[in-house]
């Protein structure tokens, strides 16, 4: 069984462990083969702010600022209107269910998934929450695989035999990756 520590004291990730703002969650990872790896976490925010959860990641002494995205939902699906008939944006709520995502490189302009080159052997890893508290249930360390191109992916699928066109409605989202995302109507022929 893996040993986890919070601020140097033993911690068990059974149902969940609370990682409060400023606390350090540390563990070791035994890597079997040299290569590029990514770290995933199953988590839920405890005191969500209107931004991603920033964390300090230390691997064998080297440090990096990483982020975990938070998911958001509208408190009400029906938008009220003000006296001028304009829609009023409902209260934003952080999704309270557990979800899994990979650590993102906060210093990268595109905030891509953080890829760590690791050698065979045991590595000391620690995560320090810098902006908000989380409940963590699982931590994954997985060998990174370069995504295949769409052409390669579609070549593996059976040929399209669908003769109908389907239209998907996308205004009523269930969750969103940013609390400021809003559905909006644009009257622009170029968008059709």
Segments the model singles out, each with a brief description of its role:
Residues 1-192:
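Extracytoplasmic
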